[in-house]
């Protein structure tokens, strides 16, 4: 199977290959705020941890909206797409919250990916509750078992996508997932993305002992 970058119709082929083969992927359920105070919520499965010291997470909105950056990226980075204000550009908030959706929030997470009219709330459309973040200018999903408040660390354009890195400022974790103040995966059931409309849970687990 040959994939040639830049060839006609190769974006679709590459997307189907990579999104189908690189699975399951964790899902960043990202909330952000526009300059006019509108709260946005959307899921992104090109997402992971990239550093522990400092604690940095990355997600990447793939592709662009017809009029430029997708709402999440524009809210964080501003019209210039850099996190800085250009001539005539609105500055971004440089802030966002990454939620991890559990399986029982799958329908809500999926609903938040709908294309809504400007000013419509993805929180309301998905039936979840916005709660003001403690440290950053954004709302978070009250029902999410894990939420990471982040400040923009770096952003990079990669082809037609935008890689956004955020430094973890504050974490919110459901008490049932904590044992002696440490994260306990026993009752954690995060949603994973496969391909198309397929998702995975993490109920079936395999434990391996690491070799010396």
What are these regions (language model features)?
Residues 1-212:
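Basic, polyanion-binding surface patches
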